[in-house]
Regions:
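Bacterial N-terminal signal peptides
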Residues: 9-17
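Sec/Tat signal peptide C-region and signal peptidase I cleavage site
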Residues: 18-25
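Extracytoplasmic
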Residues: 27, 57, 66-69, 76, ...
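Bilobed "Venus flytrap"/periplasmic-binding protein-like clamshell domains
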Residues: 27-61, 115-186
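Pocket-lining segment of extracytoplasmic ligand-binding domains
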Residues: 86-88, 96-98, 125, 161-265
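Segments of small-molecule ligand-sensing domains
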Residues: 243-295
Length: 295
């Protein structure tokens, strides 16, 4: 219901655009930057662009990306639409966090489902807390991923940085989801971090082999994180999200959103939202758990 109410508000706000001459015919191609293979963004991005192409008659493409990087490519015009997170979008627009300059060409188009920060480590590891990662080989995601930026904040709340981990004998591998799984299965990495839909296919795979456990974020660390990044919220990994969990895992989260370049005509933006809303059940067939979380 929350998702439906939000979309109705978005559509009502945009309805006045029909009083102006339509510029949709001038748009010949729309490019979306989504996420890496193995996550929910890439397949959903492809499905969304297929819907837009069919309903609006505009040629489309979908390419890989990350929450931070997508704000930059949409701002520059290299992509017309992109996947990100609400707090990342705010930071990009206002030159906060990972953004060295204001990205004023981006606009929020629509909110989707929650993104949950998750940390897993091998089941047979001697790790018991985030503090134990101080000298380990960890995989926080690629540079440009929002998950990588959140991983830095979480580690900072526990008195660590990527550099301090490397100086203590650990290592950082900036790779995508599939390579992250391979590194842990091969015994090279000791922790995998990502902000994704929950459950996530990479973690389901790792939970099958080699088997994983989850690290939670305590209340004291969460308060430090909120001071560093007010846009993050308190959330948890539900006990029924993964096989073997005995209790919810406290963590931090955000909200997935779609951004759009300000130069995309308003009536095109309106028709994109309208088309996606009309095909919501089709999107559920691509990533049922993620899209249902938006309802």
């Amino acid at each position: 219901m929350k998702r439906k109410a939000l979309l109705v508000v978005c559509l009502v706000m945009l309805m006045g655009l029909f009083a102006a001459p339509s510029l949709q015919a001038e748009v010949k191609f729309l490019r979306m930057a989504s996420g890496p293979e193995g996550g929910s963004w890439y397949p959903l991005g492809s499905a969304m662009m297929n819907i837009v192409e069919e309903e609006l008659g505009i040629s489309t493409s979908n390419g890989p990306g990350g929450g931070v990087g997508n704000c930059k490519v949409v701002d520059s015009g290299r992509a017309d639409l992109g996947w990100s997170y609400t707090h990342t979008t705010y930071n990009a627009y206002n030159a906060r966090g990972k953004f060295e300059k204001e990205r004023k060409n981006i606009r929020h188009l629509m909110s989707l489902y929650p993104g949950v920060f998750q940390i897993v480590f091998p089941e047979k590891s001697d790790i018991t807390s985030i503090a134990d990662l101080k000298d380990k080989h960890i995989v926080p995601g690629k540079v440009g991923f929002t998950g990588t930026a959140i991983a830095e904040l979480v580690l900072k709340a526990y008195g660590m940085t990527f550099d301090s981990i490397k100086k203590s004998g650990g290592a950082i591998s900036y790779v995508g989801y599939s390579d992250s799984a391979a590194l842990m299965k091969d015994g090279h990495s000791k922790a995998y971090m990502a902000v994704t839909s929950c459950p996530q296919s990479t973690i389901i795979d790792l939970n099958f082999q080699p088997g994983v456990r989850f690290l939670g974020i305590d209340d004291k660390a969460f308060q430090r994180i909120k001071e560093l990044e007010p846009g993050l919220m308190r959330t948890e990994i539900p006990v029924d999200a993964y096989k073997g969990l005995e209790a919810p895992v406290p963590t931090v989260g955000t909200v997935t959103n779609i951004i759009i370049n300000k130069d995309v005509p308003d009536d095109v933006a309106y028709n994109i939202v309208k088309a996606l809303y009309a095909h919501w059940d089709d999107l559920k067939q691509v990533k049922k758990k993620a899209i249902e979380a938006s309802d």
